[in-house]
Structures are given as C-alpha cells and as structure tokens.
UniProtKB/Swiss-Prot annotation:
The protein's name in its UniProt record: RxLR effector protein PexRD20
Localization per record: Secreted; Host cytoplasm; Host nucleus; Host nucleus, Host nucleolus
Entry's induction text: Expression is induced during host plant infection.
Motif RxLR-dEER positions after renumbering to this chain: 43-58
Signal peptide: 1-23
Cited function: Effector that enhances P.infestans colonization of Nicotiana benthamiana leaves.
Domain observations: The RxLR-dEER motif acts to carry the protein into the host cell cytoplasm through binding to cell surface phosphatidylinositol-3-phosphate.
Gene label: PexRD20
Organism of derivation: Phytophthora infestans (strain T30-4) (Potato late blight agent)
Keywords, alphabetical: Host cytoplasm, Host nucleus, Secreted, Signal, Virulence
Length: 240
C-alpha cells in the first residue's frame, strides 16, 4: 500500500508518455521506442522499493510537487468502477493465487463495451494500473488485450482516426492514441509483420493513393519498420 503513489506515477507516465510527440513518422517511431522502454515499468518499480520490517514494500518517496500533480491527475478523472485499493487486492490475488485474470478485470471495468471513448475512460487507467502491478510488459499487455477484444484492424483504424481525423479532440488524447498505435506497430514488428502485408491488408495501391483513408497506416508503419529493423540488425524484406 505504501507504494501507492509511486505506482500511480508509473501509470500516469505510462499513459501519457507521448505528450511531446507530433504526428510524423519520426514521432511515431519515438512513441514505439517509448513503448519498448515502458516494458520495464514493473522492474523499475521494484528497483525503487524496499521491504519494511513487516515485509511491506516501501516506495521511493516522490517530491511534494510530484504528489500534488498526481493528486490533481486523479481528481480530474471521473469516478472509477474499481477503486485503487480493489485493484491492488485483485493484482495481489492474480500474482499469488491466479484468481483475478486480466480478462476478468477488463470486463469488470466495463472496457469490453466498445472502443468509442475508451482512451478517455478513467477505467482504462485502472486497467493499466492493474497491468503495471501484474505484467512485465504492461503496455504490450494492454494493446494486446485491446486487439484481442476488438480486432487488430479495428484498433488500428480507431487510433489512426483519433490521431488524424477526430474533431474537437485534445492534444493529450491524440498523444495517447499515438502512444498506443506505437505499441501496436511494435507488436506488428515483433510478430514479423512486414509493410507489404500491411499494404495488402489496407489495400494500398498507386491508384488508391490520396483516396484510401487508411493508407497513412501503411506509410507510418513503413517508416517505423525500417528504423526498428536498422536498430535490430533485422534484414529488410526485398519489398516493404
């Protein structure tokens, strides 16, 4: 319980890590790299905690300004279906007795009722909080769950629309969409998805250029794929 504020800080950073990005291929790659970095969130959390005499984990004490910012962030969110303490209990059970699966928590938070508005839903932060406590790669786990629930293509188009087509959407929400689409692109890369496969999936051809509303997914992923491949020494396919 004493690591409560620090865990919330990790979740806040985890969900808002792309706030300084802009909607370009380089920014999308930056978000993809941020996703890879966030895979170590849980390990970083553990490295900043130590056991008390009663076996509790005592977190690194953040500065007052951090605590105040964290409180403000939590107060701006609407009421959660599952309070933080309940999430902590469920995470503890999941790690010790395997009684609270991420699928069950996802459903209890009513995140299985459609993608519309999900990025601004405070219960998505609660689900991320649960994953930070239970998963080694929480951002990867979250995007994987969204994809398994709603479909890879549906999630990709939804995030792309928020980034580029949505009206009256805050920059913060667009930044979160960029972060999660970056996570999706990393997932594609790790699973061996080539730009050629994405081009085929989204029916991108010269005759459809500037007419296909989702050809940008292909162009974004092509840039991300090339740069990730160059960093990993993975050979580029003959046709990307």
């Amino acid at each position: 319980m004493r690591c409560h504020y620090f865990v919330l800080l990790a979740v806040a950073a985890f969900l808002a890590g792309a706030n300084v990005a802009v909607a370009t291929t380089d920014a999308q790659l930056s978000d993809a790299r941020a996703v890879r970095a966030s895979f170590n969130t849980k390990r970083a959390l553990r490295s900043h905690t130590k056991a008390t005499d009663h076996g509790e984990e005592r977190a690194y004490k953040p500065s007052l300004s951090v605590v105040e910012s964290l409180n403000n962030w939590m107060q701006r969110a609407s009421k959660n279906i599952l309070p933080d303490d309940v999430i902590l209990v469920m995470a503890s059970k999941a790690m010790t007795k395997k009684t609270s699966s991420s699928d069950a928590v996802f459903a209890m938070l009513q995140l299985d009722q459609g993608l519309k508005g999900i990025l601004s839903n405070p219960n998505l932060k609660q689900f991320a909080y649960y994953l930070v406590l239970t998963e080694k790669a929480p951002s990867q786990a979250l995007i994987t769950k969204l994809i398994s629930q709603y479909g890879d293509d549906v999630v990709a188009k939804y995030l792309f629309d928020i980034k580029h087509k949505a009206i009256n959407v805050s920059e913060k929400l667009k930044a979160e969409a960029r972060f999660w689409q970056g996570a999706q692109y990393v997932k594609w890369f790790d699973e061996g998805v080539t730009p050629a496969l994405v081009r085929q999936k989204y029916n991108v051809h010269p005759e459809t250029w500037y007419k296909n509303p989702y050809e940008g997914v292909y162009w974004e992923y092509t840039g991300v794929y090339a740069k990730l491949a160059s960093k990993s020494n993975k050979p580029l396919p003959v046709e990307v």
